[in-house]
Amino acid sequence: MVKVLIVDDSASVRLFLQGLLAADPGIEVIGTAADGDEAVEAVARLNPDVVTMDIYMPRMNGLLATRRIMETHPVPIVVVSGNLDAEEVASTFRAIEAGAVTALPRPQGPGHPNHEREARSFVQAVKLMAEVKVIKRWPRRDNPASLPSLPCQAMVPARLKAVAIGASTGGPMVLQTILAGLRRDFPLPVLIVQHMATGFIKGFVEWLNLTSALPVHIAGNGDRLIPGHAYVAPDCFHMLVTEDGTAIELQNTPPENGLRPSVSALFRSVTQAFGAQTVGVLLTGMGSDGARELKRLREAGAVTIVQDRESSVIHGMPGEALKLGAATHTLPPDRIVTALTSLAMEK
């Protein structure tokens, strides 16, 4: 049974979310809170498995409450956004920076044509967050260790042409770390698929640009791949590269692994376009999206990196890749930065 605490200043929203969640036999709503102060107290008293957190509340807002909870009684926090305007989405990513594990839009109410679908997705996502038993943070090293010597079969035979990264739950903070750590003269385009609820990608890219050494863009169909730029897959489209490897191709073909955009689609595409001249990176997240395709990328001669268990919020995707023998390296985020820099700067 997953124990959930609902935090929202609106009594009607609390009642709505409570009805959605309590209807699932695997969930028990153990309490509600109307502001951040109440939330901090309730977490300490009730010890929930998951907290759903509103952002805009009186007294202590959701951002401060998230920070306080993560300092005192760490628990998976899901930011629930009722309004996807720029200000609220920006605040949502500040809450993720403070320790929230993911963000979800609040489902539409009864009578809306999307209500049942959105409600099912919301409830399932909240339940899955209970798998995040401990919120981990990785140490920042002033002098990161150098990349271990590459095994012969992983040596890149020619100059690299692209980096492809896939991430899910816990990915935003890791991607922020990687993009902030790369040099401004990083000589490769970086292609990113981050699983995220619809409506948050624009704010996610804006948030990344606050700290990234590279310009970060929402990928557009036909965009030319420019070295030293990062491209994030947009909502509802698979992101591929053209056969000649010069541009981005967006496709609305069926979801893969239940997902669109899919990491699998990106990895398969870069394997075809670049082969061994790619670095593939699979970060924290649940499920197995991208794992088999990362193995194929390794078999093509590419360097393939997965995030280590200790620094992953959920080690599902990287763990599946390791089981398949898909990784040439298993590294924490700061050493992924070191590895990418070392590989890209090789002459």
From Swiss-Prot:
SMART domains: REC. Phosphorylated by CheA. Phosphorylation of the N-terminal regulatory domain activates the methylesterase activity. One of its GO terms (molecular function) is protein-glutamine glutaminase activity. PROSITE patterns: CHEB, RESPONSE_REGULATORY. It catalyses: [protein]-L-glutamate 5-O-methyl ester + H2O = L-glutamyl-[protein] + methanol + H(+); L-glutaminyl-[protein] + H2O = L-glutamyl-[protein] + NH4(+). The modification 4-aspartylphosphate is found at D54. Keywords: Chemotaxis, Cytoplasm, Hydrolase, Phosphoprotein. GO terms for cellular component: cytoplasm. Residues 3-121 form the Response regulatory domain. The active site is at S168, H195, D289. Residues 157-342 form the CheB-type methylesterase domain. One of its GO terms (biological process) is chemotaxis. Pfam families: CheB_methylest (PF01339), Response_reg (PF00072). The keyword DNA damage does not apply. It is an enzyme of class 3 (hydrolase). Its EC number is 3.1.1.61, 3.5.1.44. It is found in: Cytoplasm. Contains a C-terminal catalytic domain, and an N-terminal region which modulates catalytic activity. Belongs to the CheB family. HAMAP family: CheB_chemtxs. Involved in chemotaxis. Part of a chemotaxis signal transduction system that modulates chemotaxis in response to various stimuli. Catalyzes the demethylation of specific methylglutamate residues introduced into the chemoreceptors (methyl-accepting chemotaxis proteins or MCP) by CheR. Also mediates the irreversible deamidation of specific glutamine residues to glutamic acid. NCBIfam families: PRK00742.1, PRK12555.1. This is Protein-glutamate methylesterase/protein-glutamine glutaminase 4.
